[in-house]
Amino acid sequence: LKPITTEPVLTQPEGKLVTAAWYGKGFYPISGYSRIFSHEMEARATTYVNQGDTAIWIKNSLTEYEGEQGWIRISKVDNKGNWELRTPQAIMVRTNSKNEKKTFYVTKLGGSTPAAVNERGYTVGNNLNIRFRMDSKGVLSQVTTDGSEILGLTDGEGTWYPYGSYGYKYIANEDTPVKKPANLEVTKYVWANTINKQGSETIHTFVNVGYSGNDIYMSCPADTTLYFKGTILGNKVFFKSPQFMGVSKEYNRLLYFSGVRFAWDDNSPGGYKVSFVTGDIIFDYDATSHTLVLPKEYAIVAKVFGHDTYNIYASPSLRIYPFIEKAATPQAPQFWKPERNFRNYTYDERIQKGIAQVQFIISPHDVNGEYINPDSMYYRMYVDDPETPFTFDKIDYPALPKDEMTEIPFWFTDKEYIMGYTNTLRLLFFFTEVQDSIGFQSVYKGGGETRESNIAWYKLPKTTSIQGIHNSNNGSPAKVYYDLLGRRQEGLRKGINLIRKEDGSVEKVIQ
């Protein structure tokens, strides 16, 4: 290749940093380049540098590449709205196992269409430009969206590594986000939202609330790092709608607080219909209890900038009130779709263990239905014996915060063996032998006391036979090796090794 730039630009160029919603399509390899997946993104939060009449600089231009990427220049061509991304441009330097450095480039791919991705039917060339247009509203878009002009990842010899992106569009956002005063003290409030037409089902979450004179700052239920602002006037609180809360790192979106007129409607998608409000959303306010109540004809949504999508975080009958922690007895867990439990028991060659799964719901409510603090909740697992909680350890669960634990925090997940599908639904994989039944118990440590729920038991059907990891299981290895942190390894290595034997015992060996 004959690159336009030979070194990646890793320092942010000078110019105006613009927050934007980013659209695009692309593809990326998996399983050692044996397969290629395509993807499409809509309204992803990003930033770019605008240098006015000369250039725009974008970063992370290869949408699904996870390593650090340099800034890429899009140059202005004329005063008629034409811009172009000239390639090849250096985007990164990587060091291989031999400590050799290699420069990679973004290069226009030509000679094919996305249909040929799996055959890698693209060609790579020099001085190939990808065309862009800037409209009167400042929206920067790639001219072609069909994949005939693709930005790909190549090395200096022109070899294509199967990453590619196309259909770029950047929608600038000029709004200033609401900022909570730096020293403002906030307290925990309950956001209690009725979610069905009958008013019989309420979900709860926490938001942070702070007061500065007559101003009230409240965190977004979707992301408590973002805030919206209201003004207290007598027994009312006025919230401007819409107002920009900022970029949610959790969802990678630009979010707005918005009010909507809301009505249940069985003939509409989702069973309701909404219309967005421009102006003020007015809450009733009790200054004594510091409770806010939303009138029934309104709802609160988190609206995604640059897109039609939104999430409803308050349908009618929303109440927001201070949380006061007190001692409480939690509800017992519930097994979710128990017919699925244990049925996927297999011997996993990758981790060299027998493995089974169980799904259950742990609710942050006490036995009277009152919301309790999930940050103060834990659960225990029992195997056959109601007197002895199961001990989780780092050998089977390497991501545990402690070497051994009998109580798992409500929010803990390692995204592999202990997973949270929702705020309350848990999927847990385990590697121990179960003869008769398995149980779960909720524990709440609040108000200066520790209280436990009843144990919820799931009894294995008589037709189910769960063999534990102590069995050789069709010739599986009798010994499994770990390092001191509980990470699996192939055989003995220099240093301290842990060996789990076929009988379940663990031996420490120093090599």
Residue ranges and their predicted role:
Residues 274-276, 402-426:
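Aromatic sugar-binding surface patches on proteins
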Residues 352-405:
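Solvent-exposed loop/turn segments flanking beta-strands in beta-repeat/beta-sandwich domains
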Residues 328-342, 449-485:
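Residue-level detector of functionally pivotal "anchor" positions at catalytic/ligand-binding pockets or at interdomain
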Residues 498-511:
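C-terminal tail/sorting-segment detector
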Residues 58, 218, 464-469, 485-487, ...:
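Terminal processing/anchoring signals of secreted or surface-associated proteins
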Residues 1-19, 39-43, 144-193, 201-205, ...:
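Edge beta-strand at a domain terminus
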Residues 430-448:
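Beta-strand-rich modules
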Residues 41-124, 209-274:
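Predominantly extracellular/secreted and cell-surface proteins with exposed
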